[in-house]
Amino acid sequence: MSGSYQHLSNVGSRVMKRLGNRPKNFLPHSEKFIKKSTPEFMKSDLKEVDEKTSFKSEKEWKFIPGDRVVVMSGASKGNIAVIKSFDKRTNSFILDENGPTKTVPVPKQFWLEGQTSHMITIPVSILGKDLRLVADIDDEKTPGKTRTVAVRDVSFNGSYYDADYKKVMPYRCVKGQPDLIIPWPKPDPIDVQTNLATDPVIAREQTFWVDSVVRNPIPKKAIPSIRNPHSKYKRGTLTAKDIAKLVAPEMPLTEVRKSHLAEKKELAEREVPKLTEEDMEAIGARVFEFLEKQKRE
């Protein structure tokens, strides 16, 4: 289901999400209808996955665009190809021209620039279980040289901050050999040669240094041009309406609560009786009598 109308409103987003949550008994009929109405060049031979089972992290994908892999099944078995992109609908990968492909007819309204034939060759999605990661490792027989090998499986141990991807990435190792780390491929450089973009090197270049923690680096006369002096958040005073929003309203008291508060107030106002000399002598006599009785026993 296309989500091209989700930007119109939150209501549209909810409708599109509801259409994706189809009843289980309706799924076979829905998938059959979608498959029949989808053009041949847009169909996938793999089964689509739902949002819960869709891969989201590098640990789940194991391979990312830029990795070299060897195809282990199909007509392209044994070919070394480069991963171009993910197919998140089916948890699969799209490879370059060395990967599996198929020739399909394309209606003229979908032709690309420079296309001259109705038949074109397009890549076919392939699952990760049919791929093996290709890596260059040091050759033990020839010191100083490397050899290309296909890794049966990979594991992840620890993490680090990758400056190329600008996020924390897990260490990818050969399964069973945690000391043999296979680095992630570097992402393709972003082309910013346009009038509306700034080169990242220029954007990150520091051209201003703060030389005082007391003096404001912005001139006082320049502040109104940066901040709106008429903003209601910069007034420094609170109106009655603002105070009403900040002060919580008093909750009404029940009759039981009112009687409890009145009784508590009455007890607080009652005078506490003071002990006289006679009372203190009587208490001392009773304590002395009790202690003498304890000694006799």
Swiss-Prot record:
Chain ranges of the KOW domain: 63-96
GO cellular component, as recorded: mitochondrial inner membrane; mitochondrial large ribosomal subunit; mitochondrion
Keywords, comma-separated and alphabetical: Acetylation, Mitochondrion, Ribonucleoprotein, Ribosomal protein
Protein origin, superkingdom: Eukaryota
GO molecular function: structural constituent of ribosome
Residue numbers bearing the N-acetylserine modification: S2
Locations listed in the record: Mitochondrion
UniProt keyword Ribonucleoprotein present: yes
InterPro entries: KOW, Rib_uL2_dom2, Ribosomal_uL24, Ribosomal_uL24_CS, Translation_prot_SH3-like_sf
Record note on quaternary structure: Component of the mitochondrial large ribosomal subunit (mt-LSU). Mature yeast 74S mitochondrial ribosomes consist of a small (37S) and a large (54S) subunit. The 37S small subunit contains a 15S ribosomal RNA (15S mt-rRNA) and 34 different proteins. The 54S large subunit contains a 21S rRNA (21S mt-rRNA) and 46 different proteins. uL24m forms the wall of the exit tunnel.
Entry protein name: Large ribosomal subunit protein uL24m
Organism: Saccharomyces cerevisiae (strain ATCC 204508 / S288c)
Protein's gene: MRPL40
